Amino acid sequence: MAHKKAAGSTRNGRDSNPKMLGVKVFGGQDVVAGNIIVRQRGTEFHAGAGVGMGRDHTLFALTDGVVKFDTKGKFNRRYVSVQEA
């Protein structure tokens, strides 16, 4: 027979797993085709020349080369490109 009163419930006790987002390869570093450059939610960075975008907005290298980050356009969007080495 239990000699402890029933405890109240709580609305806490949950936490989501880390998503490991962010820049994986920085400007000036070498990449080969298929390397992930940026993992992101939404288009914080846009795909430039030599860079593709996955359906979860992940940017990846389409060609071998060197990563370059720059801002362009009226809205100062940040672009990631891969230049041939």
From Swiss-Prot:
Key words of the record: Ribonucleoprotein, Ribosomal protein
Cellular component aspect of the GO annotation: cytosolic large ribosomal subunit
Matching InterPro entries: Ribosomal_bL27, Ribosomal_bL27_CS
GO molecular function term, any single one: structural constituent of ribosome
Alphabetical list of Gene3D superfamilies matching this protein: 2.40.50.100
Annotated stretches, region: Disordered: 1-20
GO biological process, one term: translation
Entry-linked HAMAP family: Ribosomal_bL27
UniProt record similarity statement: Belongs to the bacterial ribosomal protein bL27 family.
Protein name, per record: Large ribosomal subunit protein bL27
Gene name, Swiss-Prot/TrEMBL: rpmA
